[in-house]
Design a protein with these regions (language model features):
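Active-site and adjacent substrate-binding regions of carbohydrate-active enzymes
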Residues: 2-535
């Protein structure tokens, strides 16, 4: 055997050994990270729908504290936090109001029965007590929370500070807690007010809850934050929740900012009330109190997530997470054919912001209970690429809506208690499982992220780079956001050499031949490929 053959065999043997060493090293870096403050995954659970689904599956009544262990298995594997929506005492007024619009819910339930299927909005809260149809008591609720804590998971619930249900006891007992109008104002604008009989026999005209840019929510009443007592009682409600959960998602949080509240309701307030609002920002005062109570209960990282669409810089001073609806809007526009230039700029901005660990983090999503299903808005293939993109963004919380990870296409109205009949998309379900477990790894959670360069005509290609904390492993996350095949080449990564790749859409792992200068990238439409390097 000549020297050249021996040399080639030696090189092959060395390459195999190198691959084995790399595989072991990569395997270690792809193990789940114990660090839970980056790339967090949150599952939004419509509690009524999920328990109803489980009840049908197991042919028995299922409450929060009697959910079978097997129903938790996939969720515990995929998610860090569970946001239970709609757990509070339901409003009968809201349920009756919703039945007037039964015809609007038939797209989800063609055979809808208004007496059985239509319920109150989860955001028209009659009181911050458990809905007895879902969980008997806070003690029973705490039993479920304890089980999730044992699995190292967290639980969020809603806090809706802007308004109450129309039939909340305060409406009759304490009408002074609400924005009020006169009888003449009620007659001129009956849609804005609700006539409520007080305990003294007097009729009060209480305003419905409102966003300044949209019509009023007719099953709610607007709390008056110009009153010190309202700040106090709502802070007390918030503090009571701290005992039972690990965080709260704060509904329409920006509505309580002084500038927004005055823009919406300033015309109804006296000068003393206006001055009080300007001098007492609710979140600035209430959140530190809630966190102090949490610490006294040994909950050291109680969290606040804001649903907010403006004045985020104000909220960011106190909140831990805020909705990133700008990213969602960029993705929708690209899905509809817009050049992804602005999307790339926005991603670069988010990566830069992630370097500042102290600031409020983003909650990113493709859909939620308000938005249309991602498959409907973006198409199945694009939604997969978009899911990969937002999943790997560092220092964020990824929100996955109930049914999104199964490929559901029908968005359930908030006022129904039975899920639309749909079959799960098994391919999409597997895709999300692979993606969600991959993003939990040490490499992706603990690594340093940045934008990477790829050369060529790949307009729709987005490449993210992550380097492991010990700098021995590097990965490029290459995502084709377009409908055409994408080709590009990636320069050699300094002291790193490419060894393997993982095609997320195919769940296919492959060894790659070493390249000294660069390697060619050839991505199918809407596909994601991860290229791994070793130092």
């Amino acid at each position: 055997m000549n020297k050249e053959v021996l040399s080639n065999q030696a090189l092959k043997k060395t390459h195999l050994v190198s691959c084995e060493v790399f595989d072991r090293r990569l395997e270690e870096h792809l193990k789940p990270s114990q660090k839970k403050d980056q790339q967090i995954s949150l599952n939004l659970i419509n509690t009524r729908l999920w328990l109803n689904d489980l009840g049908q599956k197991y042919n028995r009544t299922v409450t929060v504290d009697t959910i079978p262990d097997e129903a938790w298995v996939e969720k515990l594997n995929n998610y860090d936090i569970f946001w239970f929506m709609g757990i509070y005492l339901p409003s009968q007024f809201s349920a009756n109001h919703a039945k007037k619009y039964t015809h609007q819910y038939t797209y989800a339930l063609p055979d809808i029965n208004p007496d059985k299927d239509v319920v109150a909005s989860p955001f028209a809260i009659a009181d911050y007590l458990p809905n007895p149809h879902l969980v008997e008591s806070w003690e029973a609720w705490d039993k479920m929370v304890k089980k999730l804590h044992e699995a190292d998971k967290k639980v969020y619930v809603d806090f809706v500070p802007n308004h109450t249900a129309v039939d909340h006891p305060w409406a009759r007992e304490h009408p002074e807690y609400f924005i009020q109008g006169s009888r003449d104002q009620f007659l001129k604008n009956p849609n804005l007010y609700q006539a409520i009989g007080g305990q003294n026999g007097q009729t009060h005209y209480l305003a419905h809850g409102k966003d300044p840019n949209y019509p009023e929510w007719s099953d709610t009443l607007q709390l008056n934050y110009g009153q010190e007592v309202v700040h106090h009682i709502m802070t007390e409600k918030l503090l009571s929740l701290v005992e039972h959960v690990d965080g709260v998602r704060c509904d329409m949080a920006m509505l309580l900012n002084p500038s927004t509240f005055l823009r919406t309701w300033g015309w109804t307030l006296n000068e003393e009330e206006k001055q009080y609002i300007q001098n007492h920002q609710f979140w600035q005062e209430a959140i530190p109190k809630a966190k102090a109570k949490a610490q006294s209960l040994n909950k050291l990282d109680f969290e606040f997530m804001a649903e907010a669409y403006w004045e985020k810089d104000v909220l960011a001073k106190n909140f831990d997470y805020i909705y990133r609806d700008e990213l969602y809007k960029h993705l929708v526009r690209v899905a509809r054919g817009e050049n992804p230039y602005h999307l790339k700029e926005h991603i670069a901005h988010l990566l830069e912001c992630a370097q500042n660990q102290g600031q409020c983090k983003d909650t990113v999503y493709l859909e939620n209970h308000d938005e249309e299903r991602a498959i409907k808005t973006m198409g199945k293939e694009f939604s997969q690429a978009a899911a990969a993109l937002i999943s790997f963004l560092p220092n964020t919380m990824l929100l996955i809506n109930q049914g999104q990870d199964e490929g559901r296409t029908i968005r359930p109205p908030m006022q129904i208690t039975r899920s639309p009949q749909e079959k799960s998309d098994q391919q999409l379900k597997s895709y999300y499982q692979n993606l969600l477990q991959l993003k939990q790894s040490k490499l992706f959670r603990e690594g340093q992220w940045s934008m990477a360069k790829a050369h060529g005509q790949a307009t729709n290609l987005i490449v993210l780079e992550v380097i492991s904390s010990d700098q021995t492993i590097k990965a490029l996350v290459c995502i084709n956001m377009g409908k055409n095949q994408t080709q590009a080449y990636v320069p050699q990564q300094n002291n790193y050499r490419v060894i393997s790749s993982y095609q997320l859409n195919k769940n296919l792992y492959s060894h790659l031949e070493n390249k000294e200068t660069s390697f060619n990238l050839n991505l199918a439409p809407y596909n994601t490929e991860l290229i791994f390097f070793a130092s």
